[in-house]
C-alpha cells in the first residue's frame, strides 16, 4: 500500500472520530453547564497522547509493521488530535474574559498530555516484559 494511502485511510478515521467526539462533548457541556467548554478537543488530544505512547512503544520494539504506524500514528492520531483547535479555543477563552480557565486549559493539555504519553509507553513496557 502506498504511504499516502495508508496516511489517508488513518486520517479519515481520525478526523471523523474527532468530529463525532467533539460534537457529542460540546452538546454534553452545553446541557450540563449552559455553555460550550472545550472538553472535546481536550479529550481527543489526551486520548491521542495515550495512544501515541502505546503505539510508539510498540514500534520501538518492532511490534507494529511500518504501514500500521503510518495508518495509526501519522494518519489516525494526526487527524484525531488538533493543536490548531486547541490554540483557537484558548484564544476564545481569553477573549471571553476567562483568563484563568484559558491558563488552566493550556496547563492541563500540556501536563495531562505528557502524563498520557508516558502512561501509554509504561503500559506497553509492563506488558511486553
Residue ranges and their predicted role:
Residues 1-129:
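Membrane-interface helix-loop junctions in multi-pass transporters/channels
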Amino acid at each position: 500500500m502506498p504511504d499516502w494511502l495508508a496516511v489517508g485511510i488513518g486520517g479519515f478515521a481520525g478526523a471523523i472520530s474527532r468530529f463525532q467526539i467533539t460534537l457529542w462533548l460540546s452538546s454534553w457541556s452545553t446541557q450540563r453547564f449552559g455553555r460550550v467548554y472545550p472538553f472535546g478537543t481536550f479529550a481527543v488530544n489526551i486520548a491521542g497522547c495515550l495512544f501515541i505512547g502505546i503505539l510508539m512503544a510498540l514500534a520501538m520494539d518492532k511490534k507494529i509493521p511500518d504501514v500500521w504506524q503510518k495508518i495509526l500514528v501519522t494518519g489516525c492520531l494526526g487527524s484525531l488530535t488538533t493543536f490548531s483547535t486547541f490554540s483557537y479555543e484558548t484564544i476564545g477563552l481569553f477573549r471571553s474574559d476567562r483568563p484563568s480557565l484559558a491558563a488552566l486549559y493550556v496547563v492541563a493539555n500540556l501536563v495531562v498530555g505528557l502524563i498520557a504519553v508516558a502512561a501509554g509507553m509504561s503500559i506497553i513496557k509492563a506488558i511486553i516484559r
